[in-house]
């Protein structure tokens, strides 16, 4: 046997052994094709089918950061105590918010079944004043209006089948007729409270006419119903290409008062939208004469109910939005009520990139009856004229 034969034989033996070991190796199974989420475009963009169901789901929300300065009465400022000498002084009002939203939709034999939820998480200080020391105690109890986590709020959580909606919503007194413009502080003169549980029915005739009837629980000390009798809201709207005319009427079952609003929206140009809204409400049972014994309400409403929150019987709001270009818009609002409260708000909103908007706003409030004994302070103003500004950064998704 020569060396060549020996080498060939050794190589053959090695190949045989390797083949035997390869035959004993574990065979890795081919990965099964992944089942990707299916897009649902029935209800708009962003929806997808929940796997194994016919329900479409969308998840969204926004992250927001507000920086405010100025007077507390403008809703933009804050006050604090100096940590060294205890003097009260101005400071920034700051608030960071994360809002989570969900939408679902599914077609059924009774119509579209929809849900909507919105939950808000906030961190910051308050648009308010520091807490003064309690002279009845020996301990120093200065509260300098510190920043911190605030209460989580459930702003929406409703179910709707066809035109029937039940759950947590905002009052149809506001949602059906529309809010008071695209300014950030649109309630310098308030136009109605918001949070409530509802049982409501919405009807769309398909020819521009729509209507709503809403049974509402209200919220807060003044607004929450005190019996089995709900608050009632009714509304009627006519919408066309030029704009819309809307009216709403509300019955406050706690104080047995009625309030209503009428609104006109017009679009005179493609890049300009304008609105004017007027409100009127009865308030005999909302005004408390605390100077007379047994001549006031058990719960003092201060002239402002759940629906008629403006001062006096009447109020109006007007404003609009002018789109300067595809990234920039100008928004303004003016409001006034019978108690001589004048609110003015204006801002510039700029879309830095799609989904990220920066808004700079200036707000002014003149509380005409500030010096009167019966002045009802809605914005917590500490003087007749308040002015402030707010800078908002918001990433929506």
Walk through the language-model features, giving the residues of each.
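Outer membrane beta-barrel
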Residues: 46-69, 79, 83, 87-220, ...
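Detector for outer-membrane/organellar transmembrane beta-barrel domains
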Residues: 234-345
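Hydrophobic, lipid-facing positions within transmembrane beta-strands of outer-membrane proteins
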Residues: 96-100, 152-157, 195-199, 230-234, ...
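Outer-membrane beta-barrel "beta-signal"
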Residues: 350-352, 364, 383-397
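Transmembrane beta-barrel strands of outer-membrane/channel proteins
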Residues: 63-69, 117-121, 166-170, 213-217, ...
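N-terminal periplasmic/intermembrane-space "pro-region" immediately following the signal or transit peptide
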Residues: 1-64
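Repeated loop/turn-to-beta-strand initiation elements of outer-membrane beta-barrel proteins
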Residues: 109-112, 163-166, 207-213, 242-247, ...
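Solvent-exposed loop segments that connect transmembrane elements
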Residues: 75-84, 128-146, 220-227, 281-313, ...
